[in-house]
Amino acid sequence: MPKLRFAVCVFFLVFSSAAFADGPADNQAGSVRPVPPPGVMITAEERAQLETDLKLLNQVIAQLRSSKNVHVRDYLPDVEIFSRAVDLALAEDGFFDPKDAQRAKDVLQEGIKRAKGLESGSMYWLNSFVLNSKGDVQRNVNVVRGFRSKLDGTVQPYGIVNRSEKDAKDVRADIWCRGRSEKGLELQFIAKQMSNSDPLPAPGVIMIHPFGRYCNANKLAGEVDTLEALEHAIQEYPINPKRVAIRGFSMGGAAAWHLAVHYPDRWFAANPGAGFSETPLFLKVFQSEDLKPTWYEQKLWQMYDCPIWARNLRVLPTIAYSGEIDKQKQAADVMADACWNLPVNERFELTHIIAPRTAHKVDPTARIEIEKRLATLDRIRTDDVPQNISFTTTTLKYNRSHWVTIHAMDEHWKPATVIANADPKSDAVVIRTENVSELSIDFAADQLPNIMAASILPYQANQADWRDKSSNLFFASRRSDRTWGVRLRRNGDTWEQVSPIEPASKAIVKKHGLQGPIDDALMGPFMFVKPSTSGRHPDVDKWVDSEFNRAVREWHRQMRGDVRIKSSEELKPEDIENYHLILWGDPMSNPTLAKIADKLPIQWTGEHVVVGDRKFSSKSHAPVLIYPNPLNPDRYVVLNSGFTYREYDYLNNARQVPKLPDWAIVDLTTPPDSRWPGKIADADFFGEKWELKPAK
């Protein structure tokens, strides 16, 4: 076997079953193939048998739903996932292989078995070790679990491959993000996870396989699904949250890259393999696509373009993997460049394991080496926080790394950076910032007990003596529970310490969880509020109806969920309290929109849509926007939009990023197509106080 070459950051692994898009053939926006693809016919006999078994399963589920037993309520999703998978396959022709009929039968039989077990109080699938037919104890390796998603209330599956020891505690877990599989819907995913242990985790390790809401590289709703699956697994298995690695290959490699840079303090290691790490270069290299993005699309690329965030890997051990002749080696090459092209005193080499003469697969020898290195990283891992933090973000959506949290930026979609040093021999944290206007530092009671102050200065690349703390020094005593923290806010050019007893501000500002863009509303619990009557203009009504139905349909097809839908008359106070509201219609057709219309920065009258000093005819234009809900400023309100990427973007995961900023005016005289909801007459981001910016 030829000797492996090593470049620099860690990632890994498994064969991706179908995986990537079709290249230049998928660059024609006017001729877009469907995703998921059309299914194949199963026989009438197979369908009849599946429908009979599904009916039986649903009857037991209906009885279980009426139970007041807390265990039944908690573990019912472990049963419902089997019913939903086959129900969707039957209703939507989600069979792509003649063997899928048998897979559906197996899935239903397991669902029926679990339903009866839950009914009798025997949740056998929870046991890590079971008795086989001979009465011997054997490991229950492959288990499919389910949880109810906060996004839309649907049950979502994930797989567990469990190689932990009997009665083990504080177990290491690896999240494995899967490769692209346009035919990998719920049925196929569950059937595979019931029996397939590839990639096999290392001995003693639990591997978590998120469904990821289908085929989106674990972005947007898929990102939330991954974190929800992890949260559920930690509750159900003896996993140490500080011993979790993020991994994947192909599309899953892309997922691992962005989850690594966005959440650098969640993992003890990252192991991305192949895939992509940004949008524009990958689409040029892999897709041969001639990109002509709008200025706001380029801004929004920064949400998932990982090279901008490369600095964050300084605190996260990373092992990248590629085959030498795999075109997707480009992903790690780009990240290696980004890591090395940081300022001289911050740059580092990315560890990149390259398998010689290997295409799009994981070389067995490389896999062994990766596992060895991950085991070492796990072994030397400590619960101590890093003394040095280097953190960059472009949005308050991702605003923390370990003991540093950014609360406000000068401007979104420009890199905001914090470089902080907490020398245990010193009494002060030294902080340098760029494009940051408010931040906090927090240590637990057992972390760096000598720290008493924070010094903050502007960030300068290659600063010679960046530890200097001669000015802007802020002191704080340990809190009564011996934790330590300080919150600092910049007022003009002057930093000031925020009093811990300062009343919470009610000002409408961009903050973590309320920073946009439009797509962010669908990364939290949301509800559609449909029109109650006709609106002011027939053409607008027609467009609203079309886009509403499309948004409901595509959430189901692409994000594998079911939208909560109510009319304004059905809306309850708890809905306003708990959900981001996606309002459809205009102020005449939607009473909820009518209540808040005059409180939005964009006005919508019978004659015009008014954006500052710009006016657009209300007969032929409609606004889409996101804004803190005037009825509950802790939640969003969105007008007339679901997630903003469309059918053309389904064909390559690198395209699946937000397409519209905080607001846009849609010219309805141009019909919607596979890329846009109509012609975008104007669009922009709101400012940091959710105000309109001057026209460009």
Report residues per predicted region.
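Gly/Ser-rich "nucleophile elbow"/oxyanion-hole loop immediately N-terminal to the catalytic nucleophile
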Residues: 164-169, 218-251, 261-267, 312
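A domain-start/cap signature at the N-terminus of enzymes
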Residues: 23-40, 92-93, 100-171
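Active-site machinery of serine-nucleophile hydrolases
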Residues: 168-237, 527
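Amphipathic, heptad-repeat alpha-helical segments
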Residues: 23-79
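Solvent-exposed alpha-helical segments and adjacent loops
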Residues: 430, 442-696
